Every structure is written in C-alpha cells, then in structure tokens.
C-alpha cells in the first residue's frame, strides 16, 4: 500500500469565495503553439520508437522555443514579411546498440520531430502557409547517459522516477474554470471557424468572478483576408460575443456574465488584425510551459505545479506523469458521493518506482451531512488503483488521448 494521506481541505469552497481569476491561452497563442508542438513531437517519437524498437525510448522534447516573425496585416489581406522561427530542442535516443548483431541502429529522430511539428502546425493554425510563414529548425540532441540509465533500468518492471518532483491536480472545475475552458474551445472549434472564419486561433480568455458576476476578457485575433472593413471587424466581434454568451449559459449556474472582446481596440486605427491568426507573426515569442497547466488552465487561486507537462517523456518523467495522474485521481475522487472539492499532490523520489510515491496527499471538502472519515477509504482506494495501473496513464499519453495544456 502506498503512502496515501487523506485530510480535510481547510478552505472555503472555491465557488463561495468572493473573488476568483482563471486564464486559458488558446491553441494559437505563442506559448500554446510551443506546448502543442512539443507534445506532438513526443507522441510521434513514442510511436516511432515502438515501431522500430518495440518500446518507447528515452526522450524529452519540452524545450521548444518560438521567435516571433513580422507581418503586415491589412484589411482584405496582408502578407508575412519575416517568418516565424520555431526551434525544436531537448534530448532523445538517436542510436541503439543491437546486442545480437553488435551493430548500431540509427533512429530517425530529427525527421520524425520536424514532420510531427509541421503536421501539428498545419492542424492548429489553418491560415498559416507552412512553406512561407514558418521555419522549423530541429536541434534535438542525444540524452544524458545517467538519465538514460535510470530510464532503461528494469524495463520489464515498473519505471523509476527520473527526478524528485511533484504533481498537483484538483476537481471538480469551478463555474469560472468551466466557462473559461469551454469558451476557448468554442472559439477554436471547427464549427465556429466554419461559421466565422475571420476568428483566428490566437485567443486568450481571462475570467474574473466577483461574487456571482463573471467577466470574460477575451483577446481574439482576426484573420485579415476575411475582414474587408472596420465594420466587418466589428461584426466579427459581435458574432463571436453572441456565440460565447449563448454557450456560457450551459455553465453559468445562476451567475451573471459580461463578455468583453479586444478591449484595446478603437475599431478604426487599432484592431487585432493578423495574417495567420496568431500574434506570433508580430514579434510575440513563445516557450513551453509558460502557459496552461496540465488541466488546460492557469488557476492562481488553486495549487499549481510550475512544471511544463508537454514534451516530457511519458514513461518516467514525474513532471508529466504525476501532474496528469493528479488530475485523473482528483476527478475520480470528486465523483464520490459527498465530496464537494478535492485536491491532490503526489511527490516522487528519484530512482524509486513511480508506483511508490514518497507521499500521495488527498485533501477534500465534504458536502454537508458527510464525514471525512467515511469518504477517506473510497478516496484511498481510487488513488491506490491508479498507482497500481499507472502504465494506463502512459498508454493514454502515447496514444495522444491526453491533453497536456
């Protein structure tokens, strides 16, 4: 049995606090572009390693950097002047010794990484010309010998932690968190893009709740080739605002909602107009891990890990596995009848099996009429079950079925 501790969460339930702030950086934000590219490269390497070697080999591709380009957007359609530059860096296993033949097997790491990055950009940024608007440069190197040894040790058994680190998670999402998350998903959905193609992918949603009032301040790039006049631009904002307000009704739960889009505009001389749908074309830079946490949100009123989740190897990198696992456990514990809120923290020790954390801390707020002592055994059972089946988390990640940002 793992060292699992359950205790009462000594705080006011989040929805009853006077103030809450929640943020999400959309998929076209420069930081999120880096997160998405890094994770796509990792997933592609996992699949390549399994195809070539039968197992996922050591890699960490969480060092993607984006250097903003330069564009000249204008009503009716502008142009890129200098391309966006994306650097893929990190470490990966590029050569493997075949013990039977004694030969060195070289693995197509750089080709796999560049192709994965470009495929992701094509999917995420529909108005970007991959041949002209972006340069993808791969400088991924060979992994550290010591860390590779930890990664490979007893491969047929449970992986060992690559570091002494921790992961955190919480559930359920608050009303504000749900609205912020679902608003960005709506604005970047295929359905909305088909209806309002001028809406770009660079969207940031900042949610503020004061009592029972929620204010969404949304930065939303517009794509210039779909906007022929300032009146068109204003209409795009109005249509998007109406869609956001309608969608939010499903989650408001009695809250008042105010939606503000592109508040820096004067709708004549200063508007958020882009060629590609992202501010990365206008000198805005990006890095992995500088935006959304593993649950897709930035939540300063909740515990958060500063670890970047995207791009880390899904076998034994605690910064990835324990952050994702913490959220999964929190979601399952929150489904127990009588649990109002749940927070999870999991701490590893380097070199120890990832199924044996130094501690797995569960904090809960019981609903009225329920006692912590009655809820504790069920919560521990859920946590232990996930530790015993931790490789399922890895399988979900490798298959691309887990969101890391």
Curated annotation (Swiss-Prot):
ATP binds at residues 141-146. One of its GO terms (biological process) is S-adenosylmethionine biosynthetic process. It catalyses: L-methionine + ATP + H2O = S-adenosyl-L-methionine + phosphate + diphosphate. Pfam families: AdoMet_Synthase (PF01941). Its cofactor is Mg(2+). Its EC number is 2.5.1.6. It comes from the Archaea. Pathway: Amino-acid biosynthesis; S-adenosyl-L-methionine biosynthesis; S-adenosyl-L-methionine from L-methionine: step 1/1. Belongs to the AdoMet synthase 2 family. Catalyzes the formation of S-adenosylmethionine from methionine and ATP. This is S-adenosylmethionine synthase.
